[in-house]
Amino acid sequence: MSVGDALTKKDVTVIHVIATVELRPGKRDTFLTEFHRNIPNVRAEAGCIEYGPTVDLRTGIAVQLPVRDNVVTVVEKWESLDALRAHMAAPHMVEYRGRVKDLVVKVELQILEPA
């Protein structure tokens, strides 16, 4: 997965990313251990404002989407699109993706800008 030429708007000042990571059954704890090992590297990157994993919370609120026990949602905020691109290509991210690839079914990104 890479952030490539499809993202061409360079003048966006804050980038929000919601990464939905679907995991193989029973692999969430192992994935989160690897994820937490990489957090200090990511938060030290230039342009990182926020970066952290979240999991679905059972609330009983009627309009909530169904709870997914095999999903980790990563909430990110970056100072710029260039910072996000650099993050995606960082050596520690390449290494991290290699460590978790057998735990992951798929990753979907929402890349957002303030409205």
PLM region spans:
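A generic structural signal for short coil/turn motifs at secondary-structure boundaries
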Residues: 28, 61-62, 85
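Active-site-flanking beta-strand signature of metal-NTP-handling nucleotidyl enzymes
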Residues: 15-21
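Alpha-helix initiation/capping motif
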Residues: 8, 24, 86-89
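An amphipathic, aromatic/His-enriched active-site/gating alpha helix that lines ligand/cofactor pockets
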Residues: 37-49, 68-110
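Short, conserved charged micro-motifs
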Residues: 26-32
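Structural beta->alpha junctions
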Residues: 22-26, 78-79
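Glycine-rich beta-strand-turn "strand-cap" elements at beta-sheet edges
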Residues: 2-13, 52-70, 95-115
